[in-house]
UniProtKB/Swiss-Prot annotation:
Molecular function terms from GO: L-methionine:thioredoxin-disulfide S-oxidoreductase activity; peptide-methionine (S)-S-oxide reductase activity
The protein's enzyme class: oxidoreductase
E.C. number(s) listed in UniProt: 1.8.4.11
Gene name in the database record: msrA
UniProt protein name: Peptide methionine sulfoxide reductase MsrA
Active site as annotated: 10
SUPFAM superfamilies: Peptide methionine sulfoxide reductase
Catalytic function, reaction form: L-methionyl-[protein] + [thioredoxin]-disulfide + H2O = L-methionyl-(S)-S-oxide-[protein] + [thioredoxin]-dithiol; [thioredoxin]-disulfide + L-methionine + H2O = L-methionine (S)-S-oxide + [thioredoxin]-dithiol
Family stated for the protein in its record: Belongs to the MsrA Met sulfoxide reductase family.
């Protein structure tokens, strides 16, 4: 099993997208990229901790590659906006790839460059590619948020 960590706006929708991907074993939403140890949603929502709302993914590389997960990421959000996605604004909603090893870093850089050259977007890609730091899981009520909503209907 391998691990991938991405940020692409509000983590609820990102988790909903990745949880449907064949080869994804598990997803967990949380916070990464900041300075505060064990941040809460309230802490991160101030925009002052440096954390991004993110998703931590465990995947089976014999079923789906890291590169294929990057394609899902690019198609899940607008990577040309800085510190916002849709109605959500602030550095906690930034687009980022948090790599866990050199192979992931190289794959992310290649993938971002290919997307830039594709001409799909008129603006430059703003997605950060940074070394993964500690991932702090979000509160339970954030986990599988959209899945929980479906069961309440």
């Amino acid at each position: 099993m391998e691990r991938a960590t991405f940020a692409a706006g509000c983590f609820w929708g990102v988790e909903a997208a990745f949880s449907k991907v064949e080869g994804v074993i598990s997803t967990k939403v949380g916070y990464t990229g900041g300075t505060l140890k064990d941040p809460t949603y309230k802490d991160v929502s101030t925009g002052s901790t440096g954390h991004a709302e993110s998703i931590d993914i465990i995947f089976d590389e014999s079923v789906i590659t890291y590169g294929e997960l990057l394609e899902v990421l690019w198609n899940t959000h607008d990577p040309t906006t800085k510190d916002s996605q849709g109605p959500d604004h602030g550095s906690q909603y930034r687009s980022a790839i948090f790599y866990h090893d050199d192979a992931q870093r190289e794959a992310a850089l290649r993938s971002r460059e290919q997307l830039e050259r594709s001409g799909k977007y008129d603006s430059t890609i703003k997605t950060e590619i940074v070394k993964a730091s500690e991932f702090s899981p979000a509160e339970d009520y954030h986990q599988k948020y959209f899945q929980k909503l479906q069961f309440k209907r």
